[in-house]
Amino acid sequence: MLRTMLKSKIHRATVTQAYLHYVGSVTIDADLMGAADLLEGEQVTIVDINNGARLVTYAIAGERGTGVIGINGAAAHLVHPGDLVILISYGTMEDAEAHAYQPRIVFVDADNKPIDLGHDPGSVPLDISVAAELFDPRIGAR
């Protein structure tokens, strides 16, 4: 049996730009793509924390070290500069691999710089400034 599992997540990134007249995709700082194990052209789900919009597109690498998160094409109608987003990638794997697989979870600061790297999709790092705002599904509200 094949299972579709969380592969990568960049949590609470800030959208830095949006270009409506573009062929599509999301531009992600190449450093963030590396931290999250994302490849150019990989399918990515974007969840907008501000308005609840969800959409599927593909990743393209942006300039390293810039913190760029750019929404391109028609998605710019749904997701705007300043919005907080979660970028998610899924992978399909055999059952045995799914039981052992550890996803890449990247928490970022307000400038989209990685501040916590982990593998637990449900954990909330205690040492980041937004931790008090986040609900940990395993322990409840903080």
UniProtKB/Swiss-Prot annotation:
Q: Which domain of life is it from?
A: Bacteria
- Family statement drawn from the similarity comment of this UniProt entry: Belongs to the PanD family.
**Positions modified as Pyruvic acid (Ser)?**
S25
Q: In which pathway does it act?
A: Cofactor biosynthesis; (R)-pantothenate biosynthesis; beta-alanine from L-aspartate: step 1/1
Q: What does the UniProt function comment say about this protein?
A: Catalyzes the pyruvoyl-dependent decarboxylation of aspartate to produce beta-alanine.
Q: Which residues bind substrate?
A: T57, G73, A74, A75
Give UniProt keywords alphabetically: Autocatalytic cleavage, Cytoplasm, Decarboxylase, Lyase, Pantothenate biosynthesis, Pyruvate, Schiff base, Zymogen
Q: What class of enzyme is it?
A: lyase
| Post-translational note | Is synthesized initially as an inactive proenzyme, which is activated by self-cleavage at a specific serine bond to produce a beta-subunit with a hydroxyl group at its C-terminus and an alpha-subunit with a pyruvoyl group at its N-terminus.
| Protein name as it appears in the record | Aspartate 1-decarboxylase
Q: Which GO terms describe its biological process?
A: alanine biosynthetic process; pantothenate biosynthetic process
> Record's Gene Ontology CC terms?
cytosol
According to the record's subunit comment, the protein's assembly and interactions are: Heterooctamer of four alpha and four beta subunits.
Q: Which GO terms describe its molecular function?
A: aspartate 1-decarboxylase activity
Give the reaction(s) catalysed. L-aspartate + H(+) = beta-alanine + CO2
Q: Where is this protein found?
A: Cytoplasm
User: How is the cofactor bound, as the UniProt entry phrases it?
Assistant: Binds 1 pyruvoyl group covalently per subunit.
